Structure formats: structure tokens, C-alpha cells
UniProtKB/Swiss-Prot annotation:
Region described as Necessary for localization to the centrosome: spans on this chain: 246-286
Any GO MF annotation of the entry: identical protein binding
Major location (coarse): cytoplasm
Biological classification of the source: Eukaryota, Metazoa, Ecdysozoa, Arthropoda, Hexapoda
Protein name: RAB6-interacting golgin
Organism annotation: Drosophila melanogaster (Fruit fly)
Keywords: Coiled coil, Cytoplasm, Cytoskeleton, Golgi apparatus
Disulphide bonds in the chain: none
Length: 338
């Protein structure tokens, strides 16, 4: 499609509704006479039943809420004309209502978006008509025909109810000249067939986008699960390494403790043996000195004994009258000894 759907032209709407050019606010002469002419019009379809069910649920919810007292006829006339007294103030939208409207416009499960409803029914929706996505049927003041794909904008000024809900006729209530149909729609100039094709294409694109989103979410979920498994495996390996390291460290610490104990015992033995060695060495040195002293003393005793013996023999020879010869003189060992 090269062109956007700009809505139905004014001539097509007048041809379908049966309203003449000069009489916008006038009703057809006969409702029954207009039905056969409108039934043969091609391309007009009933709105989905889902929207009707939503409208019925909305009516029930509004009826269950605490209803305000019934307005008097003069107040109803003021409501029709769209004017209000200076003392009356229009209701101000609350933040909760604005949040509900914003959340409703983002709902992907809805059959029609707000912009599409505005294009089909009212063109650019005014602030008076922007209440909820299905507030085109007001249970308190209006009861309009919701079975037509076309809807002449009447807002709150439509007070007469339609007796034929299954008819394809649009709403035939009286409208003021200033509330004429707004045909400035973005889908103006495109037939219903092209609009249906465009709608189906948009729905197919939305389905493809949803499928792509679901696939992306599934891939992200699978990727996250795989990363979680990898992280869990890494944690398991790290815990295993830490446990093996703890076992090895405990074993080595035990061996080191045993080696320390053995080293202490050997060191004690070494110190003891070293002390014994020093003691034995000292004893050996003392014994050697004592041996030398005793040997020297023995030699001295022997030498002195020989000297005394020689002197005694000399004295005895002199008493006898023998003279000792030179050869028999005693040898002084003390002089020869170094």
C-alpha cells in the first residue's frame, strides 16, 4: 500500500447514511425504508463482539458504582447543548484515570488501539470524548447503536436509544450543525478492502514482532541458563581445587611437624654427643699430660738413684783404700739432659 487510509469521504458517508447534503441534523423519513437501501451497501461489517462485551462490562461497572441523583430535564438540556452554568465546573481528570488510560493504550491484547478507534469513529478525539477506550457508549445518558462500523459523532448529546441493535444502520439521532462528522481522518481516500488489507498487514507485523520478542526472550533465557551452568561448573572446580589444596596443605603440615620433632631430637642428641666429645677430649689431654709427667718423674727417680748408688760405692771404695779410676766416674745425667 502506497497511501495511508485517510478515512471515508464525506460523499461516501452521506451515501451510506442516507442523509442529504443540506440536512445534516434531519432524520430520514422512514427508518424501515432506509434499511433495504443500506443493507445492499458493500464493505460494511459489524464490529467484533469483543468490543460489545467490553462496552457491556463497562456499563455494568458504571451502574454498580454509586450513581449520582437523576438530573432534571433542564440539566439534561444543558448537557445536550454542551453548555454549563458558571457555577458548574467540568470534572477534572485524576492521575489514576490518566494512568489507566496510559496503561490501556499499551495493552497488546486489545483488538483495536486508541488511535484506530479515534480514526474509525471520531477522527481526532476531543477532550470531551477521551474517557476510556470504550466510553463511546454512556449508560447514564446515551444508548447508541454500536453495531455499525461507522458512527456519527454525537457524544453526550445523543439521548434517544436505538431499538434495533442488530441493524447495520448508523446512529440516527439528532445532531447539531456544529457537531458534524469529522472526516479529516488519516485513512481518508482508501476503500474498506484496502483498509482491511492494511489492518491484516499490521496484525501480521505485530504477530511477527511478538514472535521475535518471544524468541529473543527465549534465547536470552537459554543464554542466561548456559552462563549459570558455566558459572556453577567454575565454582565447583574452584571448590574442588580449594579442597585438594587444603588436603595437601594439611598433609604437608603434618610431615613438617614430624620433621620438626625429629630435628629437635637429633639436635638434642648432637648437643649431648658434642658435650661428651669435648669432655672426652679434655680427659684425653689430661691423661696425656699425666702420662708425660709420670714418665719424666720415673726417669728422674732412676737417675737420682744411680747417682746415690755411685756415690755410695765411691765412699765404700775409699774406706777400703781403693782409689776410683776415671773410667768409673759416674755420669751426671742431669747435665746431659736438655
Amino acid at each position: 500500500m502506497t497511501e495511508k487510509f485517510n478515512g471515508f469521504s464525506h460523499d461516501e458517508i452521506l451515501k451510506i447514511t442516507g442523509v442529504k447534503e443540506g440536512g445534516v441534523g434531519k432524520r430520514p423519513a422512514s427508518l424501515e425504508a432506509a434499511k433495504p437501501a443500506l443493507r445492499i451497501q458493500p464493505g460494511i461489517r459489524r464490529m467484533p463482539d469483543k468490543i460489545f462485551r467490553q462496552a457491556d462490562q463497562l456499563r455494568k461497572q458504571q451502574q454498580q458504582q454509586p450513581q449520582q441523583p437523576i438530573q432534571k430535564p433542564d440539566v439534561a438540556k444543558k448537557t445536550k447543548s454542551g453548555t454549563a452554568t458558571p457555577t458548574e465546573k467540568p470534572p477534572t481528570p485524576t492521575p489514576a484515570a490518566e494512568d489507566d488510560v496510559a496503561n490501556g493504550s499499551l495493552n497488546l491484547d486489545r483488538p483495536l488501539s486508541d488511535s484506530l478507534i479515534e480514526a474509525l469513529y471520531h477522527g481526532n478525539a476531543t477532550a470531551r470524548d477521551k474517557k476510556t477506550p470504550a466510553t463511546y457508549a454512556d449508560a447514564e445518558t446515551t444508548s447508541t447503536d454500536d453495531s455499525s462500523i461507522l458512527k456519527i459523532s454525537g457524544g453526550d448529546s445523543q439521548t434517544t436509544s436505538s431499538t434495533d441493535d442488530g441493524s447495520i444502520l448508523p446512529s440516527t439521532q439528532d445532531t447539531s450543525p456544529r457537531e458534524r462528522l469529522n472526516t479529516d481522518s488519516p485513512f481518508k481516500g482508501i476503500s474498506l478492502k484496502d483498509f482491511e488489507q492494511h489492518r491484516r498487514m499490521i496484525e501480521e507485523q505485530n504477530k511477527q514482532k511478538k514472535q521475535m520478542l518471544y524468541q529473543a526472550i527465549e534465547q536470552h533465557t537459554q543464554k542466561t541458563a548456559a552462563e549459570s551452568r558455566k558459572i556453577e561448573e567454575i565454582r565447583h572446580e574452584l571448590s574442588k581445587l580449594e579442597s585438594d589444596l587444603a588436603v595437601d596443605v594439611a598433609l604437608l603440615r603434618k610431615q613438617i611437624d614430624n620433621a620438626c620433632i625429629h630435628f629437635a631430637n637429633v639436635e638434642k642428641q648432637y648437643v649431648k654427643i658434642e658435650a661428651q666429645f669435648l669432655r672426652a677430649k679434655i680427659e684425653l689431654h689430661n691423661a696425656s699430660e699425666k702420662k708425660e709427667l709420670l714418665t719424666e718423674h720415673l726417669c728422674t727417680v732412676i737417675a737420682h738413684n744411680e747417682d746415690r748408688k755411685a756415690q755410695k760405692l765411691t765412699e765404700l771404695m775409699q774406706k777400703v783404700g781403693l782409689s776410683p779410676t776415671d773410667d768409673c766416674q759416674p755420669i751426671d745425667l742431669t747435665q746431659q739432659s736438655p
